[in-house]
Amino acid sequence: HPEIDLVSTPDGKLVGMAHSNNCSSDMDAWIQLLGEAAEALGAKASTTELYNNLLQTALDGDPDCGGLLSYGYISGEHITGFEEGRPLLARSSNSHFTLANFIRAHLFSALCAMRTGLDVLLKDEGAQIEEIRGHGGFFKSPEVGQRIMAAATGTPVSLLQSAGEGGAWGIALLA
C-alpha cells in the first residue's frame, strides 16, 4: 500500500505508519489570524493562551462540526492523492457557523489523512488497535487533542505527561 510508510522503531522493529503531511498547519494560520483580530480589538494574548482558549471551544461544538468542512492541506498529501496544498473551508448557508464548530472542523481536518491511512491498515491489512499513544503539539492543550483524536479514530488515546513535547523529546531520552 503506497499510503503507508514503513519505518523502524528505536529498537529496530518494522512498523507501518499512517503518515500525514498537514496535521495542524492550517489551524496554526487561523489561530494566528484570530490572535491578530483579538489584538486589533485591544486584547493581548500569548500564543499559548490563544491555543488553549480557542481549542478548548471545540469541545462545545456540534458532533458534525455544524456542517463546516475543512481541508487543511497547506502542502500536498500523498495519502489522499493531492500533489499541492489548497486549504479550504466550506459551509452551506444554513451551517451552524460558530467559533466552536470552526475550531472543531479544523481539528478533525488535521486528522483526516492519518485516519485514511488507519483505514488501510485496519480494513485492508486486518491490523488491530487497542490504544493510540498521542504526542506532539496537537496534544498541548489539555484534553482537546486527546478527545478529538479518540472521536476521529474510535480508539482510546492516552498521553504521557510530556505528550506536548513530541517525538524529539523521546529521541533525546534514548540518546
Question: What are the language-model segments listed below?
Answer:
Residues 1-133, 138-175:
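Active-site core segments that coordinate phosphate-bearing ligands/cofactors
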